[in-house]
Amino acid sequence: LQQAVEVLKQFSGRKFDQTVEIHINLGIDPAQNDQIVRGSLVLPNGIGKTQRVIVFAKGDLAKEAEQAGADAVGAEELSKRIKDGWLDFDVCIASPDMMGIVGPLGKLLGPRGLMPSPRAGTVTTDVARVVKEYRAGKVEFRNDKGSNVHAVVGKMSFDATKLVENIGAFISYVQSIKPNSVKGTYIKSIAICATMTPSVRVSA
């Protein structure tokens, strides 16, 4: 892993700070509901940017979300902004009583991976904690149809040690949520890359 990060950092001569991603190919059958791999974790060193977080909530929960640093908080009026084409955010959180308002936005939010979900922890009554976690660098992922999971793990400007810590934490977390029904090799391959670089394989 250390070698892979050092190889990747040799490509860093671009004028902007490239985002570093991890791609893991899994030995799962994505058509089976009991083999879906999804989750979220706060990386030890963040991801190098403050994520823009919006929250669907009312009353006290709305106040808590605002105090925690949410970029936008609301209900019907927030839904209308999204329906009108506003999607300038990275994370969408909702309190459970707001799902009646959020549900119809699924066609807009779902394809972008922004739909709040109880399994991902983005449908919650503890909105303040979740807002703080995402602003601190929490990443969320779900396997795609090709049995891959992808996530941002930092920036090229990070020290190699910090990238290694983030990538190691992500791999360990993915290993820890292996579905019980998966037989054979679970992690088939791991690669890291940045915005403008080739992929570098990591030994699984």
At which residue positions do the language-model features occur?
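Translation machinery proteins
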Residues: 2-63, 84, 90
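Structural signal for hydrophobic packing residues in well-ordered secondary-structure cores
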Residues: 5-16, 30, 131-138, 171-178
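Long, charge-patterned amphipathic alpha-helical coiled-coil/hairpin "stalk" segments used as oligomerization
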Residues: 70-175
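Flexible, glycine/charged-enriched surface loops at secondary-structure junctions
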Residues: 16-20, 177-189
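Ordered, amphipathic secondary-structure segments that act as subunit-interaction surfaces
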Residues: 51-70, 76-78, 101
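Residue-level signature of catalytic and energy-coupling elements of molecular machines
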Residues: 4, 65, 110, 192
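Flexible glycine-/small-residue-rich
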Residues: 24-26, 57, 95, 153-155, ...
